[in-house]
Amino acid sequence: MASLNDSHFDLFDLPAQFALDASALDHAYRTVQAQVHPDRFAAAGDAQKRIAMQWATRTNEAYQTLRDPLKRATYLLHLRGIDVGAENNTAMEPAFLMQQMEWRESIEDAAAAKNVDALDALLTELRDEERMRFDKLGALLDSGANQAAGEAVRQLMFIERVASEIGTQIERLEN
C-alpha cells in the first residue's frame, strides 16, 4: 500500500500528467477504496479504525481532485512547485481581460432583458471556450510550460465562475 504522503497519482498508480484515463482512475479508486474502507475495519481496534478513516478520507480527496480537470491541473502544478495563487495573482493578459468585460456586460444585458436564450447562448460560448482552453492547458502542462499553465488555470477558474453566474441568472429567470 502507498503512504498517506504519496501524491494522488501515486496513490492510484497513475502517471503524473494532465491527460488522464477516467476509467482507469475510477477502477483504481474502487480498488483502493475497497482496501481501505472503514467498514472493513469494524471489528478492529480504535487505532486501526482511525487509520482506515484517514485512508478513506485521503482516497476520496485524491479522487475528487484528479477527476476534476481544473483541480487536477492545479494539483499537478503544485507538485511542480507552482502556486497558482488565484486569490492573489489576478494578473492576466489584456485580451482576456477585455473578453471578461464583454462576458460580464452580456450577462448583465441578458439578465436585465430577462433573455434566457441569450444567457444559454453565452453559456454555450463559454463552454466552447473552456474546452479549447483545456486543450491548450494540456499542451502547456505536457511541454513543461508551468508558468503559462498557471495563467491558463487562473483563466479557466474565471471562466468557471462566469459560467456559474450565468447558471444562477438562468435559474433566477426561470423561477
Swiss-Prot record:
List the GO molecular function terms.
ATPase activator activity; protein-folding chaperone binding
Q: Which SUPFAM superfamilies match?
A: Chaperone J-domain, HSC20 (HSCB), C-terminal oligomerisation domain
Name any GO cellular component annotation. iron-sulfur cluster transfer complex
Pfam families this protein is in?
HSCB_C
Question: Which Gene3D superfamilies does this entry report, sorted A to Z?
Answer: DnaJ domain, HscB, C-terminal domain
Complex formation? Interacts with HscA and stimulates its ATPase activity.
PANTHER family given for it? Answer: IRON-SULFUR CLUSTER CO-CHAPERONE PROTEIN HSCB (PTHR14021:SF15)
Q: Which family does it belong to?
A: Belongs to the HscB family.
- The name under which this protein is listed is Co-chaperone protein HscB homolog
